């Protein structure tokens, strides 16, 4: 068997038929799998010494979420270094990155593997991988035929990446015009909700607008901020992060605007604030809704006039900073109740973005699970970490109230449990390793705090009740004191004092 002109023409036609890049890539590898009669095919993008799957056929869905580092996958490293067709012998000692990831063949090792590096000029931009359970599957195809396939795929991938670069406005005025692949932001997901969010990020990134990023706790608002900064002309300058909820009122102004020597007790030298550090760059203010009204007024002045004043200094400093703010609160409601300034809200929300909760992202759960499995594999020095079909279904059926952060913790916990019950360096995650309805769900049954131990008097009963209420609020809000205070409808400072009196904190 060999490639006919008709087969090669068919591959080229498929690359033109797709509506978008993703569709074209999927058509390409599906066609290749059929033509080569192999068990699995994948198109990978190369960036920062790792391969990122763009399209797969015949592989488990979570492969799309995995990131294959060269250091962790010697076969892919060999493909990256070769510069030509790579054929791995059936008895190769090098582990295949897809071992255990071919549906229906989870317990078997891949036998035949061919790798085709893809180039744009002299730059490695990706690879095609072809795998089969039959050892001699690819022997009937010559290297020259496989090079033709690689050339077609490389052309399609190069064009797609160049268009992506131009659409994201990464080809800045005054740049050399040299092709430079856009760096990945780890925003993994192909669901309609995530696709829409990525489009909105591309639209706003190239502008200089302030952006308000909303979404539940654990959805990945910081990743959105990083993606906006990375796609902006300010990307060559710093992205400075500040968690407003972690700021004590006494030092919040100094953290934002800096201070001069002697401004207050302990100010032994001049110190720049976050705005100065972010000059000509971007400042990301996480949990912006936790700022006091007094600080909100000072922040508004910076957004209006671009001037800051260090604590203890009469002089003003000019700064050029783009502000990205994030919150899990409904700031419109906060404005109505007087807890957030309406003028600041309107300044920040010129282009609002909303990060969807994980329960609305469908199969993205499996992609993210694959990403976290690969992270655990590298961190723990394991040869492979894979999800069983039952585990995938289990993850898809769960509601994920803690969103992506909860999924990450659940995967890490499951790997540790599975590793403890299985000898060797290969881990297969089963549904029972998660036990999500009981063990991982962050909100305990509502009646749990009612089953209190018998107490001698009213005061002791009241204190026990308060302790349990605070513990539950903290558990439900990822130990975020500000969010827990809101849930309990009390002031965060009062909550800290009460917790200290009840012995819940030092």
Curated annotation (Swiss-Prot):
Residues 481-500 bind DNA. Keywords: ATP-binding, DNA-binding, Nucleotide-binding, Phosphoprotein, Transcription, Transcription regulation. ATP binds at residues 215-222, 278-287. GO terms for molecular function: ATP binding; ATP hydrolysis activity; DNA binding; DNA-binding transcription factor activity. InterPro entries: AAA+_ATPase, GAF, GAF-like_dom_sf, Homeodomain-like_sf, NorR, P-loop_NTPase, Sigma_54_int, Sigma_54_int_dom_ATP-bd_1. It holds the Pfam family Sigma54_activat. The modification 4-aspartylphosphate is found at residue 57. Pathway: Nitrogen metabolism; nitric oxide reduction. HAMAP family: NorR. PANTHER family: ANAEROBIC NITRIC OXIDE REDUCTASE TRANSCRIPTION REGULATOR NORR, TRANSCRIPTIONAL REGULATORY PROTEIN. This is Anaerobic nitric oxide reductase transcription regulator NorR. It comes from Salmonella dublin (strain CT_02021853). The gene is norR.
């Amino acid at each position: 068997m060999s490639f006919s002109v008709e087969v090669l023409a068919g591959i080229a036609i498929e690359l033109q038929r797709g509506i978008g890049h993703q569709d074209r890539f999927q058509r390409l590898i599906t066609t290749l799998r059929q033509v080569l009669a192999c068990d699995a095919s994948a198109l990978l993008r190369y960036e920062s010494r790792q391969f990122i799957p763009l399209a797969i056929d015949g592989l488990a869905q979570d492969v799309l979420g995995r990131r294959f580092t060269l250091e962790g996958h010697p076969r892919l490293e060999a493909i990256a270094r070769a510069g030509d067709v790579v054929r791995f012998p059936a008895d190769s000692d090098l582990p295949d990155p897809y071992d255990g990831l071919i549906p229906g063949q989870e317990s078997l090792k891949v036998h035949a593997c061919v790798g085709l590096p893809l180039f744009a000029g002299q730059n490695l931009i990706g690879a095609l991988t072809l795998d089969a359970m039959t050892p001699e599957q690819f022997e009937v195809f010559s290297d020259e035929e496989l090079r033709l396939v690689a050339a077609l795929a490389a052309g399609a991938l190069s064009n797609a990446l160049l268009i992506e670069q131009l659409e994201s406005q990464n080809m800045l005025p005054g740049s050399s015009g040299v092709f430079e692949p856009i760096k990945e932001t780890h925003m993994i997901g192909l669901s309609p909700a995530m696709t829409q969010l990525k489009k909105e990020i591309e639209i706003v990134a190239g502008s200089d607008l302030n952006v308000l990023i909303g979404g539940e706790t654990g959805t990945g608002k910081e990743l959105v901020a990083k993606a906006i900064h990375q796609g902006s002309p300010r990307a060559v300058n710093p992205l400075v992060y500040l968690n407003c909820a972690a700021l004590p009122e006494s030092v919040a102004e100094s953290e934002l605007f800096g201070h001069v020597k002697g401004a207050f007790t302990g100010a032994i030298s001049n110190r720049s604030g976050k705005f100065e550090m972010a000059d000509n760059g971007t400042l990301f203010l996480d949990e912006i809704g936790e700022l006091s009204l007094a600080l909100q007024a000072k922040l508004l002045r910076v957004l209006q006039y671009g001037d800051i004043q260090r604590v203890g200094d009469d002089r003003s400093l000019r700064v050029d900073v783009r502000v990205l703010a994030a919150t899990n609160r409904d700031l419109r409601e906060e404005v109505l109740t007087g807890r957030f300034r309406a003028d600041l809200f309107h300044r920040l929300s010129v282009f609002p973005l909303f990060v969807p909760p994980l329960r609305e992202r469908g199969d993205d759960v499996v992609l993210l699970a694959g990403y976290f499995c690969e992270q655990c594999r590298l961190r723990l020095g394991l040869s492979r970490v894979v999800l069983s079909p039952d585990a995938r279904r289990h993850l898809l059926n769960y509601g994920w109230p803690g969103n992506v952060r909860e999924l990450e913790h659940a995967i890490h916990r499951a790997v540790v449990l599975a590793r403890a019950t299985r000898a060797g360096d290969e881990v297969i995650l089963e549904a029972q390793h998660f036990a999500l309805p009981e063990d991982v769900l962050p909100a305990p049954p509502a009646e749990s705090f009612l089953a209190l131990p018998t107490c001698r008097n009213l005061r002791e009963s009241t204190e026990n009740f308060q302790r349990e209420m605070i513990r539950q609020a903290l558990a439900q809000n990822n130990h975020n004191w500000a969010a827990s205070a809101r849930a309990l409808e009390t002031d965060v400072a009062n909550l800290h004092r009460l917790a200290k009196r009840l012995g819940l904190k030092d």
